[in-house]
């Protein structure tokens, strides 16, 4: 690897090399031991998006506990979140939207990024069927929030082929696997079930473009959770959790005849496990959340992210938080600045 010689012969020079992680996923690249530091990169968070678009004060409010922020300000931030749902966090997309104010131009950049991914897929035809890889990529984007099965990801190919495509996309960090687990203790990964899983995409903007979400129609929705059947909201939460809190995501699911239950996410804060639901509001059904809190007494409280302002119920077991508050609900990752 030629870059090693910069480290050895010119260590004062700062070098950044960019490229597709698919090459790493296929094992095409060798890394010189002891000469590479790894830093996990993510799309820009909602906080970073607000900073980039000149809304510094609003950005700082998103990192504050919502009880310390006036309800009217929370509502303004939620309105701004609508734009982020469609612009997403890819830096070039954010820059285009900031400079032009045009969603159309932003969507064009998103399409170019997706085309570049597909061009990357075609380079690795001997390793994996390109059509299968692209079909699984699209299937995951359309299935955010749903439990997945390899056999259903792409009807035209075998479960084994679909799994290979899914695993390669996950290794390249274009998608992220979210297994179910038993929240009876830490670490959550100790009880992860690799056969029961959901998935999220790299970026919410790319996800909506890939799914061809009808933007004009969805922007008329007053409730963020109603946009694209709630899939945009769940993708947003997954994306923010990965950036702020953890390199792994988990959820809880119970399959019982006539009494199935599922809680969208599990987060860890100060050594305690908190179930997290992404719901339309206090009036929505929270049966699964109540069932989990009853079954797992070690969970001190349930958190509900919704399209409204902060609200804590009298029994103290449920707290309703504005959807943008994902950055405040779990332990912050050490490398988040």
Language-model features: locations:
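Active-site-adjacent loop/helix micro-motif of nuclease/hydrolase catalytic cores
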Residues: 281-291, 313
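Accessory nucleic acid-recognition modules appended to NTPase machines
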Residues: 95-270
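Interdomain motor-coupling "hinge/lid" segment immediately C-terminal to the ATP-binding subdomain
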Residues: 19-20, 26-143
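Conserved catalytic/switch belt of AAA+ P-loop NTPases
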Residues: 1-22
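A short acidic, amphipathic alpha-helical/loop segment
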Residues: 1-5, 165, 288-292
